[in-house]
Structure formats: structure tokens, C-alpha cells
């Protein structure tokens, strides 16, 4: 980089090289990989047994009869898989290379992650007895994201660990709350309900 940009390269230079198709017959290549992210450490919160032993109002309706780890309910292993496929070659004086990249990235919070597809086409045409080269580069990206609700993590650390995630079908409130258990308190929402039912998404393409 310094040989190209001189002193202007002192702060760092990113060089991007666009690949072109190789001469000869068509060549197809593929590579891919899978990764997983997990939460290393979490905040220690009161579990159902501790809640029952420490809460002085446990016999006055605070015990909802379940044992729920709310942090486990709203988190998951963040599984990501990436696939890259390319096709290159030449026909006469025209060389070509088409490449596609697909990424499906899952977040550690439920309903969080994105799916992205990238495509690129490079064409190179020789003309005038190889004295002139005409290059054409086309690229496109399509991405759909689910941003999730980080507030679900806050409620997961506050919510009653003896409350169930969902109500029995026979419960009269099951239809009211969409099947989820919900305490009628201000700013005290079922973490799984807001993570699963909330719509927080976006998309873009170029």
C-alpha cells in the first residue's frame, strides 16, 4: 500500500481486488461454513425455588405454580451458516465470473438475526486485437433483518420465575393474551410474549 499511496498510506489502506474469470472451460467452486454463538455469562437471578423460599407473599397468590428460567426462554444458540458459490470461465475473447454469497445469521435472542444474499457478475471483453479491454461489473444485495426486542432481556431478569410462559387452553385469559401468561401490572410484560409477538424488522436491497 505504501508503494502505491506513499505517506497517505500511514493511516492504513484497504485494497480491494475484483476477481475476473479465468480463460478456458467453466469452473465452479463452493465453500461454506457454520458457526454458533452462545452467551458466556448471564446475570444471576432468583430461580423459582429461591423465589418461593424468600417471598413473604408466596401464599397470597405470588406463586403461579410453574418453574421458568426466563433467560433461557428468550435466548438461543446463535447459529450462522454461510455459502459461497462462483462460476468462471471464458467464451472466445469474453471472460466471465459470477459469484453468489448467502448468509443466514441467527442471534442469541429469539426472533433476532438476518438473511442476506449477495450477487456479483464480472465480464471482460477483449477488442481491437487485444489492445482494448472492456470490463463490466454488476453487484446486488438483498437483506432481511429481524432486530428482536432487547427489552425482553430486561423483563427476563425481572419476571416471576413461578409464572408459566403460556396459559392452559382452558384458562379464561388464554384468548385475551394470545395464549401467553400475563400479569396485569404496569411495565411488567411476559418476556417471551414480547419477543415472539413483537414485529421489529427491516430490509434493504441494492
Question: Predicted regions: what is each one?
Answer:
Residues 6-10, 76, 112-115, 150:
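Short, glycine-/polar-rich solvent-exposed loops and beta-turns at beta-strand/coil boundaries
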Residues 18-20, 89-91, 102, 121, ...:
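Residue-level signature of outer-membrane beta-barrel architecture
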Residues 72-74:
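C-terminal beta-signal and adjacent terminal beta-strands/loops
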Residues 76-94, 101-104, 117, 191-206:
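Outer-membrane beta-barrel transmembrane strands
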Residues 1-29, 80-82, 95, 101-106:
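A beta-strand signature from Gram-negative outer-membrane beta-barrel systems
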Residues 10-14, 47-48, 115-116:
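Glycine-rich, phosphate-binding/catalytic loops in enzymes
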Residues 22-67, 108-109, 118-205:
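Surface-exposed loop/interface segments of Gram-negative outer-membrane beta-barrel transport/assembly proteins
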Residues 12-16, 98, 119-121, 204-206:
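Conserved short hydrophobic patches within well-ordered secondary structure
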